[in-house]
Amino acid sequence: MFITNAPFWCIHLLKSENIICRGIRYDAKLVNNDGIDPEYTRNLLIENIEFNNGDDNVAIKCGRDNDGWKTSCPSENIIIRNCKFKGLHGVVLGSEMSSGIQHVFVENCTYGGYCKRGIFIKTNPDRGGLFVIFM
């Protein structure tokens, strides 16, 4: 699959389980143009993807403020491997993270081009949350 110039978030996985994202290529360099945004997502494999996005390549989220606290469903058990990151940020945790993010594993990924941060943890003092990360 090839995604080009999609507006805003290209793939938003909301309250999803047991998902595999594999072999996607991106050329989508618009403002706030994320590649994959799993939110309240469990058991996700992201592999063999070439990102070239205008913002976050993978942005793991789990609810904003009261919505996240009420839902109490963390994003967890996420494996990201064998990916090429070229967007602004490689793997982002937050800032919507009120339900927590845990058991994230990143391996064998490359970062290049205009990528500012390989791993970026976005926080907000009002949102709370928990991160459990494996790299």
Where does each model-flagged region fall?
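Extracellular/periplasmic carbohydrate-active domains that bind, remodel
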Residues: M1-M135
